Amino acid sequence: TDPNHAFGDSRWPWKADYLGALRGWTRAMQGRVVIYDYDQSMLVWRDLPNPSHQVLQAEIKEHARLGILGFGTESRNALATTFLHLYFRGQLYWNPQLDVQAELKQFYPRFFGPAAAPMEAYWSAIYRAWDETIVTEHEFFVIPAIYPREMVERLGSWLRQTDAVQQ
């Protein structure tokens, strides 16, 4: 399936097919369904930010309504790729109502200190790029479509601001 968009996203009607199949399986199995979750960080390219918690945040409430028993997530410890989204995935599995944006607002100043503002801009731009992408594939050749040169230059400027704050 398309790992970049939630199954409620009207731009991608085939995601409704996936949701229909999931509903069918939970009915047939009387709710005894566990999802093998191939975390998106396994895709695109190692050490390229590739967040996926936004998709899970949009889908997890439906998983809870369907009575999904749990998840088995396959991922890796490539922190530039997985950074916060594995933490948020774990939190969302336990609490589908988690307010990720509120958590992020607390995270940036706690983790980055005086560099919080440029790092919030940096990560927000990355999250927005994945939210807004029309890319449905998930291999290395999509990198320029998600991270065009202009965006990479903007990301670089926020990293330089972060570096300046820490000097």
Placement of each model-derived feature along the sequence:
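Charged, amphipathic alpha-helical linkers/stalks
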Residues: 95-138
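Glycine-rich phosphate/pyrophosphate-binding loop
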Residues: 132-158
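Catalytic-core regions of glycoside hydrolase
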Residues: 1-105, 110, 149-156, 160, ...
